[in-house]
Amino acid sequence: MLSEKTIEIVKSTVPLLQEKGVEITTRFYEILFSEHPELLNIFNHTNQKKGRQQQALANAVYAAATYIDNLEAIIPVVKQIGHKHRSLGIKAEHYPIVGTCLLRAIKEVAGAPDEVLNAWGEAYGVIADAFISIEAEMYEEAAHKEGGWKDFRNFVVVKKVKESDVITSLYLKPEDGGKVSSFIPGQYVTVQINIEGETYTHNRQYSLSDAPGKEYYRISVKKEKGVDTPDGKVSNYLHDHVKEGDMLPVSAPAGDFVLNMDSTLPVVLISGGVGITPMMSMLNTLIEQDSKRNVCFVHAAINSNTHAMKEHVEAVDNEYEQVKAYTCYSAPTEKDLEMKNFDKEGFVEREWLQTIIPTTEAEFYFCGPVPFMKHINAVLTDLGVKQEHIHYEFFGPAASLQ
C-alpha cells in the first residue's frame, strides 16, 4: 500500500512525463540493452528502431502515474501488456532489472531528486507486483489447458500456402505429436526465429488465422519490403527460407482482442491488408459453430494481387446467407476493373460503410495499419457505435487512435 506522500509525489511528475516521457523511455532502453544485451533476444528490434516501443512504454508510465491512486483503473492495460509478456517469456526476475534502469533514466533525463526517485521506486514495486501476479496466472492457465504448455514449444511447418503476392500462410503442428491448446478467435502466438548470422533471436507475434479446434495452428505472414530492414529481414526469412518440414519454437496463444462468443449481436469485421488474419479466425469460427449472427465482412486491399484469402471469403459469402462480404481496392488492376471483382474503389469511407453495415448495434472488430485503424475508429465513433462494442488490435506496441 502506497503512502499518501508517495502518491502525491508520483502524481506531481505527470506533467514531466507528458513532456519528457519518450525521452526517458528511449534512454531507459539504451541503458537496459547496454547492461543486459541478452534481453535483445526477447524485445522486437523493429519496434525499438521505429520508436514504437518507447512511445508505448511512455504511455504506460504516464498512465501509471496518472492513476497511481486508483491502479484498478489500469488493470485492463496491465492485462493487455501481460498477454504480450507471457507470450514472450518475460519472467518475474526481469522486473527488478527494468525498475533499476527506469529509475536511472528518470534521474539522467529529468534530473529528478532522491525524493522523487524513492517515490517512483516504491510505486514501481507495487506496479511490478501487479504485472507479476497477473502474468503468473496467465502462465499457469496456458500450461494447464489441454494441449497447453509453458514458454516455447517446437512446431513443424507441415504446409506452406501462398495466399497473395505478399501474404503466405504457415500451418504448424507440434513436433512432439501432441495436441495443441484451444484459443479464442483473435488471439496470437509468438514465433521465435533464429536467422543464421544474426546475434540475437527474433520474436514476432502473428495472429492465428484459422478457427480453433484444429490439429494445427495457422499463421499468415506479410512479406515486408526490404531484406535490410528489421521487419523485412524476419518476414522475408519466413517467406523465402522457411520450408515445409522446418521447425519453429512457438508460444501458447495469447491476447485480449477476442471474439465475444456470448454476444448475440451482429458482427462487423473490418480489416486492412494483413489485418485480415485475426478476422479470418473470427469468421471461420462463426460459420463452423453454426452461429446465426449476421456477419458483415469488410476488407480493404491495394488490389486482388495483394488480397489474401479472397476466394475463401467469397465462398463463405455465397454459402452462408447470414454472411455479407465487401471488398475495397485502393488501386485496382486493369483485370480487377474488367472483372468487377470488388465493391468499391478507393478507401473505406464513412458514407460507404454506413450503407453496408447492418446496424450500429453490433460488435465491431477492426485491424490493419495504424492510420487505417484511426480512420475506422473515428468513423464508428461518429456513427454513434457504443465504445464497449468497438474492439481493435494493434500489430505491435499499442498506440493512440485519437
From Swiss-Prot:
Keyword Oxidoreductase: yes
Gene3D superfamilies assigned to the protein according to its UniProt record, in alphabetical order: Globins, Nucleotide-binding domain of ferredoxin-NADP reductase (FNR) module, Translation factors
Stored PROSITE patterns: FAD_FR, GLOBIN
Enzymatic reactions: 2 nitric oxide + NADPH + 2 O2 = 2 nitrate + NADP(+) + H(+); 2 nitric oxide + NADH + 2 O2 = 2 nitrate + NAD(+) + H(+)
Single GO MF descriptor: metal ion binding
Cofactor note: Binds 1 heme b (iron(II)-protoporphyrin IX) group per subunit.
Residues bound to NADP(+): 273-278
A biological process from GO: nitric oxide catabolic process
InterPro entries: Cbr1-like_FAD-bd_dom (IPR008333), FAD-bd_FR_type (IPR017927), Flavoprot_Pyr_Nucl_cyt_Rdtase (IPR001709), FNR_nucleotide-bd (IPR039261), Globin (IPR000971), Globin-like_sf (IPR009050), Globin/Proto (IPR012292), Hmp (IPR023950)
Transmembrane segments: none
Key words of the record: Detoxification, FAD, Flavoprotein, Heme, Iron, Metal-binding, NAD, NADP, Oxidoreductase, Oxygen transport, Transport
Domain FAD-binding FR-type: 150-260
Site-annotated residues for Influences the redox potential of the prosthetic heme and FAD groups: 84, 393
Amino acids binding FAD: 188, 204-207, 394-397
Role of this protein: Is involved in NO detoxification in an aerobic process, termed nitric oxide dioxygenase (NOD) reaction that utilizes O(2) and NAD(P)H to convert NO to nitrate, which protects the bacterium from various noxious nitrogen compounds. Therefore, plays a central role in the inducible response to nitrosative stress.
Name of this chain's protein: Flavohemoprotein
